[in-house]
Amino acid sequence: MAQYEKLKTLADGLSDKMTMFVNHEANGRSGHLSHALAEYKKGSVIAFYSNCSGKRNRWAPGHNGFGWLEYKRSNDGGLTWDEAKVFPYSWESFLNEPFTVSCEKAVSTQENEIVALCIRNENPNGWEPYLTPVAVRSEDGGETWGEAVEICDKRGRIYDAIVHEGNIYLLLLANDDFLAVKPEHRYYIYKSEDHGKSFSLQGELPGDTANHAYGSMVIREDGSLVCYEYDSSDEFNLVYHISDDMGKTWKESGKGFCAKRIRNPQVARVSGGYILHGRAGCMTKDLPMHFVLYTGTDGIHWDEGRYIYVDQGQTAYYSNNLVMDRDNGTQRVLIQASIPYSKGCVNIGHWLMEI
């Protein structure tokens, strides 16, 4: 319990700890959706982000995927970063294909390997409809990249990916639009046993998916897998499903209360407990639409939460996290999120927790 109290104290102290990672405002650009993070060697981190139009999308100029992906790398666990590099597949697609590319998740199963899990967007003023997702691999720490390989024949969006016992597991909502509105709009788990070269269907999540979107996964201390879904009709309660066999079967489903609401949830297990962060809802104006961070002891029940970035972000706060185990037995947690600066335009911020 002392370790959890330390975690809560650290979380409470993050509100003034944001550092600017990408200043899109300087160029009138924006950067939604793509926040893939991976540690591909001890202390070596890759962080993706999008470089997109600051004007497209009449509803919220800057809230779109019309552009390409870039990434930076760090050799000191996210303290300092090298110069940005363009992700080749996204640039080639932007120039020559009828779709753009986003990347919300990346993983690594061995040293210097990076597997970027990409979604493909047909709408030049937004994202949807989505095409089938693809994986793009690097075996030299992001110096060069291979060809894109289709992950499955289902159109949709990859919401999370984790590595367990050397295998990759990803969470896909099979829906070419945003919210699930049809019976066939289901969440699936896919598995790769060959470092992201191919994927096979592992299982299907249970329950009603009507009005659901987004998702996250975490492996708890007891080895159980928890998958989460966002319910747009109930932003105070985060849907969860628990499996003891990595998504083949499910033993429990329910909802976890989030006092400040949650949208696009991102969950991680850290020393002392669990963290959950995302936009603090936006379907109504009852509460602020800030960037919220919760802590908990079991990945199901959450504390009262705290805002770690305060600005009305109706289209902001897409986020991700990376937990790094350090040689001295401590952990460093990197959180990356889009932060608003004008209408639908966003910069990219970083937060670091030393646990």
Describe each region flagged by the PLM:
Residues A2-I355:
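Asp-box/BNR beta-propeller blade signature and adjacent active/binding-site loops
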